[in-house]
């Protein structure tokens, strides 16, 4: 049983530091959290034990936890870990930044037909996955469909789910009335899957029309409309999708569309990504990823056998097992997102040079090592283009010859794992800006002053990465801006083109596990006189100690 701790004034639970509140529910809050070692953001649902007992929802919570632990699907929110304290349960789940589909529709109105189809295809794929695992959601609605940064759908909140067995019928009436099927509000027996189909029909209608097919403030009148099954179809809806809606919103559950019927419908099949309904589903394959195991070993300074034992033990609370699944899921999320976006809008430039390469979020091409093939397009249509935020405005950019940093052909995850290991060994303190950008400081034992620098991993070319070191001097920033800069302000770590005002000095290349090589140069900002206290020398000593530790 874990205990809550304080970390820089914030609550720390296990390896996660809790931040802002994302939402408040019946049983507690949902806060954003950050894994101390990996920097991954998570959503932490905090459930108060006393409130759960007083509301008599112990069974509901247990079902939610049980169901989420079973699921590994690209469009279902994942549950990584459950941490227990004497007063609360902390459910560590996948974090998505786009908010609820409900809020998106309220803000933007109805969605374009192609976009509505894309989101609906993702939602139905997730529902099909649930049903194949004998689970019915029973409370599908736009509020329970979340959106990630790439506008992909993620189904959440399985608290009202029931495990579905052959020949077993569900009799419990639950969920939201606007989205509930007629047999649910009437208290009749129902098998399960058909009630999710009805709710999916209501969601599809909301996407296409921006309103609900059945709505009334007077609940008895609302129930009458749902039982009648009569709803308005706008003229702008094409005939094909209208027939699909009418089939899904059939009052008689025996005549209602099945997932098989929807998948075979001509409107649904248009531009359907193959990964959503694979011929041989492999979401839950029990294959151990050797590279992920090695990454966990590097982050936690443990042996491969320890990680394997944790995975084979079947203990979902084991820290090594949790870290392993975090690595796998984050890698898979990016790969899957790129696969179905590439199908409709191939990226330009160097992305095409190496189809197997995927740029993780937060990793930027180096501003002075941009391949000449990358050029600004009139309009970036592919979401992967958003990752490349430093495209040059002109191809005639002068390339810098020297940098202070380390160049490597290792994978970015491996490089950052080595950096974390070295910083921990050197007792550095750091703040994660994103997975590949850190602000680091070390206290000078003699003067008591803090020496600060920024570490940023850049993409140099298709196979090389540069870990760039940049000095951060609060007094220098104050001289340049005319105002003091807060210690933890991200503006101090903003991107600047490195220009050397000192004589560049190269050092012998160092080997890091046979893959990293280092070169030293000046990276100080020009036109600012050096201040007292030898900040420049402290900075170089800090760099040298980190490079030396990395080279071991």
Swiss-Prot record:
Molecular-function annotations in GO: [hydroxymethylglutaryl-CoA reductase (NADPH)] kinase activity; AMP-activated protein kinase activity; ATP binding; chromatin binding; histone H2BS36 kinase activity; metal ion binding; protein serine kinase activity; protein serine/threonine kinase activity
Chain residues that bind ATP: 22-30, 45
Chain residue ranges for the region called AIS: 291-376
SUPFAM superfamilies noted in UniProt: KA1-like, Protein kinase-like (PK-like)
Gene that specifies this protein: PRKAA2
Name of protein: 5'-AMP-activated protein kinase catalytic subunit alpha-2
PANTHER family (alphabetical): 5'-AMP-ACTIVATED PROTEIN KINASE CATALYTIC SUBUNIT ALPHA-2, MAP/MICROTUBULE AFFINITY-REGULATING KINASE
Enzyme class of the recorded protein, top EC level: transferase
Phosphothreonine PTM positions: 172, 258
Function: Catalytic subunit of AMP-activated protein kinase (AMPK), an energy sensor protein kinase that plays a key role in regulating cellular energy metabolism. In response to reduction of intracellular ATP levels, AMPK activates energy-producing pathways and inhibits energy-consuming processes: inhibits protein, carbohydrate and lipid biosynthesis, as well as cell growth and proliferation. AMPK acts via direct phosphorylation of metabolic enzymes, and by longer-term effects via phosphorylation of transcription regulators.
Compositional bias (Low complexity): 509-519
């Amino acid at each position: 049983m874990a205990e809550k701790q304080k970390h820089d004034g914030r609550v720390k639970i296990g390896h996660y530091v809790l931040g802002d509140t994302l939402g408040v529910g019946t049983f507690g809050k949902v806060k954003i959290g950050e894994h101390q070692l990996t920097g991954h953001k998570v959503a932490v649902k905090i459930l108060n034990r006393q409130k759960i007992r007083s509301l008599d929802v112990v069974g509901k919570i247990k079902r939610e936890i049980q169901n989420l632990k079973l699921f590994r699907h690209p469009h279902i929110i994942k549950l990584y870990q459950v941490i227990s304290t004497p007063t609360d349960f902390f459910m560590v789940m996948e974090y998505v930044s786009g908010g609820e589909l409900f809020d998106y529709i309220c803000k933007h109105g109805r969605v374009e037909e192609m976009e509505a189809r894309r989101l609906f295809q993702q939602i139905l794929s997730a529902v099909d996955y649930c049903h194949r695992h004998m689970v019915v959601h029973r409370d599908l609605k736009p509020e329970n469909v979340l959106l990630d940064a790439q506008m992909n759908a993620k189904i959440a909140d399985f608290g009202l789910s029931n495990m579905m067995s052959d020949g077993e019928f569900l009799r419990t009436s639950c969920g939201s009335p606007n989205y509930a099927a007629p047999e649910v509000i009437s208290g009749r027996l129902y098998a399960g899957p058909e009630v999710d189909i009805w709710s999916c029909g209501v969601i599809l209608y909301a996407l296409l029309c921006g309103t609900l097919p059945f709505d009334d403030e007077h609940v008895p009148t609302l129930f009458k409309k749902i039982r009648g099954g009569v709803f308005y179809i706008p003229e702008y809806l094409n005939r094909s999708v209208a027939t699909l809606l009418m089939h899904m919103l059939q009052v008689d559950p025996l005549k209602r569309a099945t997932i098989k019927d929807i998948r075979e419908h001509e409107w649904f099949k248009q531009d359907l990504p193959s990964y959503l309904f694979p011929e041989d589903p492999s979401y839950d394959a029990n294959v151990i990823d050797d590279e992920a195991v090695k990454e966990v070993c590097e982050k936690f300074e443990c042996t491969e056998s320890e990680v394997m034992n944790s995975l084979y033990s079947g203990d979902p609370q084991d820290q090594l097992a949790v870290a392993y699944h975090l690595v796998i899921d984050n890698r898979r999320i990016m790969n899957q997102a790129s696969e179905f976006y590439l199908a409709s809008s191939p990226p330009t430039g160097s992305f095409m040079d190496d189809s197997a390469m995927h740029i993780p979020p937060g990793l930027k091409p180096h501003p002075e090592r941009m391949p000449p093939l990358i050029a600004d397009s009139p309009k970036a249509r592919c979401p992967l283009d958003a990752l490349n935020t430093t495209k040059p405005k002109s191809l005639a950019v002068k390339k810098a010859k020297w940098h202070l940093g380390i160049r490597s052909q290792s994978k970015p995850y491996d490089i950052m794992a080595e950096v974390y290991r070295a910083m921990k060994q050197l007792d550095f303190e750091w703040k994660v800006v994103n997975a590949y950008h850190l602000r680091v400081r070390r206290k000078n034992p003699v003067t008591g002053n803090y020496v600060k620098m920024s570490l940023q991993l850049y993409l140099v070319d298709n196979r090389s990465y540069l870990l760039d070191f940049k000095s951060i001097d609060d007094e220098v920033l104050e001289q340049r801006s005319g105002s003091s800069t807060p210690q933890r302000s991200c503006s101090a770590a903003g991107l600047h083109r490195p220009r050397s005002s000192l004589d560049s000095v190269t050092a012998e290349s160092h080997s890091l596990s046979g893959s990293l090589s280092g070169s030293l140069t000046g990276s100080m900002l020009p036109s600012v006189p050096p201040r007292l206290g030898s900040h420049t020398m402290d900075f170089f000593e800090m760099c040298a100690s980190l490079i030396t530790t990395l080279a071991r």
